[in-house]
């Protein structure tokens, strides 16, 4: 099963997360993921971008049945576009 979740990166005490589509059986920080969908920088200051999501790829994976983690759902709402994680019917 494919999941959309966060993968931690960055240095000690300076977290940085990738939003990735990955196999649910893999560990969070294994380095293995199918596709990078964006990133989240929780310690962004000033003009730094805090959150970036590729909407079209996110929509593609959710339409294929990927499960979304709770934290990523919260981030999508913060991104102010909750429609991108709604289930879409493949045509």
Swiss-Prot record:
SUPFAM superfamilies: Ribosomal protein S16. Gene3D superfamilies: 3.30.1320.10. The keyword Ribosomal protein applies. GO terms for molecular function: structural constituent of ribosome. GO terms for cellular component: cytoplasm; small ribosomal subunit. PROSITE patterns: RIBOSOMAL_S16. It holds the Pfam family Ribosomal_S16. Keywords: Ribonucleoprotein, Ribosomal protein. GO terms for biological process: translation. The keyword Endoplasmic reticulum does not apply. Belongs to the bacterial ribosomal protein bS16 family. This is Small ribosomal subunit protein bS16. It comes from Ruthia magnifica subsp. Calyptogena magnifica. The lineage of its organism: Bacteria, Pseudomonadati, Pseudomonadota, Gammaproteobacteria, Candidatus Pseudothioglobaceae.
């Amino acid at each position: 099963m494919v999941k959309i979740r966060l993968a931690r990166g960055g240095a000690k005490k300076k977290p940085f997360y990738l939003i990735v589509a990955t196999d649910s059986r893999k560990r969070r920080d294994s380095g293995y993921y199918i596709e990078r969908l964006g990133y989240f920088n929780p310690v962004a200051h000033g003009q730094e971008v805090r959150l970036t999501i590729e909407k079209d790829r996110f929509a593609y994976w959710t339409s294929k049945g990927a499960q979304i983690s709770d934290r990523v759902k919260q981030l999508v709402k913060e991104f102010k576009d909750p429609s991108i994680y709604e289930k879409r019917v493949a045509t």
